[in-house]
A protein has these predicted regions:
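Jelly-roll (double-stranded beta-helix
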Residues: 1-484
Length: 484
């Protein structure tokens, strides 16, 4: 499975590489040679830099990009809070309010969340046919504080229509990982285009403006916004120089720009920015997608999950799920793992994931198919589950029974399936929309999944039992302690 088979053909070309320095120009010779800020950039362009890290960050972690654009970002009217009624943009639910749970509702900076040590699972989320990309985002769970650049937010998006052609969106709150479940995203960014299809992920850095259209109709998927740090590739350790997600398989957009000579000069553009969890809007008389050339290390990218090189045990036991890690965060905040089709060949081994309690919170989603550790039918594409810090979880009772008695032949699992898990070292609070208002939380999750587990313990006869006491009582031949 060196690549996925897509129903929608690719329409853009890309550069490749993760964590590498890139350059691209839509017009030949638009990039300066040997310097960044020439007195007069080529073709009357402006020089603008976007920094994704501190200036003095170590070289391997320094993220910045130089842009050569037609008009600088600063040329816009002042930002104002976006009004609650947006009937002309499809965001109102009819009574002047935003959809409940949407990202732009004031969540009091993640303080109005429910923290509870129970297993949670959600049915597939309904698509909101009236909302565009920005206004379809719903917060499921989160931790941290946006204003101090700490923590992260987990979202589900269910958009039914494209963004207005003259609207651009960016988030000052963090770097966004997009995991598409259904539909197609045609993403136009300041640095070029990304076409994202199911079985592809995309990452949009903090502050990069973009526009999302839906060429194949409604979309649904998952998103993780890192408020601190950026996504990185995990270290490979004993695996050596390659494996899991290889750097060469990440695709980076090439420069593309809106030509101001096409007759649209002077038309108004709406710039929407998420800032500390709130939406703000400004207008300007030129396209924000006017970067003719750029070079740097701070850019959006996408990745085909079918290119993931899976590793596993070829002798015995089920290794830690870290072998499936696709992306990690630079601050050790989160790890993203996927479960693609793979062979299981372990001998004398319970092959599904073992029962587990974890210092990491585990959020799972399903892109397609059926997850091999869940056969109860409750974990479906477009739904999700959350097993928070130190909350027990593992295979459902039917999976345990089946795997305990299975003939251990080489077995291909996950055909036509793709699940993912995002692990975080933070306690995750659940939004009120995810907990109750969405109506998607499965109230019988525990009963359906694990209450069917029964004790199979059989105490052996004639085997010595070791007491935890330093001076255990002596027993007679009947195994009973003598009377005092």
């Amino acid at each position: 499975m060196p690549s996925s088979k897509f129903n929608t053909p690719e329409k853009y070309r890309y550069n490749t590489g993760f964590g590498s320095y890139q350059e691209s120009e839509a017009i030949e010779n638009a990039l300066p040679i040997g310097q960044n800020t020439p007195q007069r950039p080529a073709f009357g362009l402006y020089t603008e830099k976007i920094s994704g890290s501190a200036f003095q960050a170590v070289r391997s972690e320094n993220q910045q990009t130089w842009m050569y654009r037609i008009v600088p970002t600063v040329a816009h009217l002042p930002f104002e809070p976006e009004p609650s009624r947006q009937s002309d943009h499809g965001a109102s639910n009819g009574d002047g309010e935003y959809p409940k749970g949407s990202v732009f509702q004031n969540l009091n900076n993640y303080r109005d969340l429910t923290y509870i040590p129970t297993q949670i699972r959600w049915d597939p989320f309904d698509i909101d046919t009236t909302s565009d990309w920005v206004h379809s985002m719903r917060l499921l769970c989160a931790a941290g504080d946006v204003s101090t650049k700490s923590g992260m937010g987990y979202f589900v998006f269910t958009a039914g229509r494209s963004m207005d052609a003259h609207t651009a969106f960016s988030s000052s709150d963090g770097e966004l990982l997009v995991i598409l479940q259904t539909g197609v995203l045609d993403i136009k960014t300041e640095l070029g285009h990304l076409l994202v299809r199911p079985l592809e992920i995309a990452v949009i850095p903090r502050g990069i403006k973009y526009h999302v259209s839906l060429p194949a109709g409604p979309v649904r998927g998952y998103a993780l916004e890192l408020h601190q740090g950026v996504f990185t590739l995990p270290n490979l350790g004993p695996l050596g120089s390659f494996g899991c997600a290889n750097a060469r398989d990440f695709q980076v957009p090439v420069a593309a720009y809106d030509d101001p000579t096409d007759g649209e000069t002077g038309e108004s553009y709406r710039i929407v920015t998420k800032y500390n969890g709130h939406l703000f809007v400004a207008s300007q008389d030129h396209s924000p997608f006017d970067v003719v050339a750029w070079h740097g290390s701070y850019f959006p990218y996408k990745y085909d999950l079918g290119r993931f090189m899976t590793v596993g045990s070829i002798s015995y036991d089920h290794p830690d799920p870290s072998i499936f890690t696709l992306l990690a965060s630079s601050e050790g905040l989160a790890e993203v793992a996927i479960f693609p089709p793979r062979w299981l060949v372990m001998e004398n081994t319970f092959r599904p994931p073992w029962y587990h309690r974890n210092t990491m919170a585990e959020f799972m989603g399903l892109i397609q198919g059926e997850y091999d550790a869940r056969v109860d039918g409750g974990f479906r594409p477009g739904g999700a589950s959350l097993h928070n810090v130190m909350v027990g979880h593992g295979p459902d009772s039917a999976t345990h029974a089946r795997a305990s008695d299975a003939e251990l032949l080489p077995q291909k699992v996950g055909e036509g399936s793709m699940a993912f898990v995002i692990e975080s070292n933070m306690l995750l609070g659940v939004s009120s929309w995810a907990w109750s208002k969405s109506g998607k939380r499965q109230l019988n999750y525990n009963a359906q999944t694990w209450l069917g587990l029964r004790s199979h313990f059989k105490k052996p006869q004639g085997v010595k039992e070791n007491s935890p006491l330093l001076n255990p009582p002596r027993h007679n031949m009947n195994g009973k302690a003598p009377p005092n």
